[in-house]
Amino acid sequence: MGESTRIVYDGFPELTGGTMCGHGSIGTASMLVETGMVPVSEPYTDVVLDAPSGVIRTKVRVENGRAAEVSILNVPSFLYKRDLEITTEKWGTIKYDISFGGSFFAIVNAEQIGLSLERENVDEITKLGMEIRRVVNETVDIKHPYLDITTVDLVEFYAHTDNPLADMK
């Protein structure tokens, strides 16, 4: 499985892009249950996946032989570096942290620079995220303690919301 999501169930083709993602893990577990490629039992079927970052354990709730929902227990996550800064021409100094949860993430509070995380700003958010990722990977020494993972793959922005349905999880 990989990013963008694709599931290979036979052979060893060359896989480009990222090699792991949470939604790919959920999709793979669902596919394995629904195609009968794993022994299926109701109400739950456990599926274990081996990914480049480690073992991912999934629990598939099965109804009438179909995957109804999937929960995952991902690889151990941790805070790698805290309170780092980069400077951009447009946004000035931006503080961020680097965390790990299957891959490395740069975590940015968008409120510090006045960037509203609204749909109308998606192009600006994307552009800034790509710039942050590039600069971080060019300037910060990143090395997983025991896996061969040495780059930030994703930038995640967060901000407060007044939407009562958003729980920040």
Please provide the spans of the model-predicted regions.
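Active-site proximal loop and beta-alpha junction motif in alpha/beta enzyme cores
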Residues: 1-20, 25-169
